[in-house]
């Protein structure tokens, strides 16, 4: 499937692919070292303590409609097997590891479910919504998360806001 995202840890690159596959590549000799098959259209990926956290974004149903998933897979990086599935907000896309936690953005369903910045505690496997109406994130300097919120009012007027979220303090600037 179409490669989507990549994360490198130690001697391996982990690549998510549409069609429900994660490929484990040995970066020393560029050989395929393992494969996980599951889900549908996989996007963001991050490694934390030997576990891969992978966003299972959406499925296309029999009528060619997009159905947004609410899943982050936890995959054992050594064996490339599914350990568990964590429920998150619809349409998860990007994941980052900061200060021992996993942070992710979900895009929502573009109708009645808004995008959200969320965290996953790797120790408990639970997810929590931090902020709603967040549409894009990236990790930045000083372990800050840079956020964009793009929302529309009842007349379809776009409003953009840019801010940072500090995972250590919870401060929004």
Where are these regions (language model features)?
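Predominantly soluble domains enriched in secretory-pathway, periplasmic, or organellar proteins
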Residues: 1-173
């Amino acid at each position: 499937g179409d490669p989507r995202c990549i994360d490198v840890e130690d001697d391996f690159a982990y690549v998510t692919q549409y069609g429900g596959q994660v490929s484990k590549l040995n970066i020393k000799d560029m050989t395929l070292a393992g494969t996980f098959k599951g889900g549908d259209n996989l996007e963001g990926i991050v490694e934390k303590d030997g576990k891969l956290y992978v966003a299972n974004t959406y499925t296309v149903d029999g009528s060619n409609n997009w159905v947004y998933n609410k899943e982050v897979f936890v995959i054992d990086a050594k064996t490339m097997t599914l350990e568990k599935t964590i429920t998150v907000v619809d349409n998860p896309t990007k994941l980052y590891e900061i200060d021992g936690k996993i942070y992710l953005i979900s895009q929502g369903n573009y109708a009645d479910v808004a995008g959200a910045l969320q965290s996953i505690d790797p120790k408990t496997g639970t997810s929590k919504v931090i902020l709603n109406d967040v549409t894009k994130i990236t990790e930045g300097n000083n372990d800050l998360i840079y956020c964009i919120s793009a929302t529309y009012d009842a007349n379809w007027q776009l409003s953009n806001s840019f801010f940072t979220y500090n995972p250590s303090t919870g401060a929004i600037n």
